Amino acid sequence: MDEQEIQRLVEEVSLQYFGMPFLHKAMFNSRLRTTGGRYLLNTHNIELNYRYYEMYGKEELVGIVKHELCHYHLHITGRGYKHRDKDFRELLKAVDAPRFCKRMINEEKGKKVYMYECMECSLQYVRRRQINTKRYVCGKCKGKLILIKKTS
């Protein structure tokens, strides 16, 4: 899905569910990490997270678009557009938009694991942070530690 398709989708959803046109820009923002989308108050544009579309498909994206359009139309008409406002919550229910989007499954960020072993007593240590083996020693026998495995 490219920028023109997302613009067309937002305009269609706006007319279908809200009965009002969307007159500004809708675009994907690759810098969004934990949020499905955002409505920009200054420019009235809507930014969407492309990774939600890749992960959950068009249905979830339409839900995110409806949520952001609730912010948009309420702000344009001068009513309460914030999450805590009654107008916003009522409009969410009326158009069946989600209040929150699904959690992002973060598969690309694997946790690094470092495995150290004592050269004297062979005790193994598993750590998430790398340690300085010249400075730290085994807590059991004070032997020297060596890095045996690093997984990412």
From Swiss-Prot:
GO cellular component term of the entry, any: cytoplasm
Chief subcellular location: cytoplasm
InterPro entries given in the database record: SprT-like_domain, SprT_Zn_ribbon, Uncharacterised_SprT-like
Cofactor binding annotation: Binds 1 zinc ion.
One annotated GO molecular function: zinc ion binding
Entry's localization field: Cytoplasm
Stretches assigned to the SprT-like domain: 7-148
Active-site residues per Swiss-Prot or TrEMBL entry: E68
GO aspect biological process, one term: response to stress
Cofactor(s) the record lists: Zn(2+)
Keywords: Cytoplasm, Metal-binding, Zinc
List of residues binding Zn(2+): H67, H71
UniProt cross-references to HAMAP family, sorted A to Z: SprT_like
Family: Belongs to the SprT family.
Protein name: Protein SprT-like
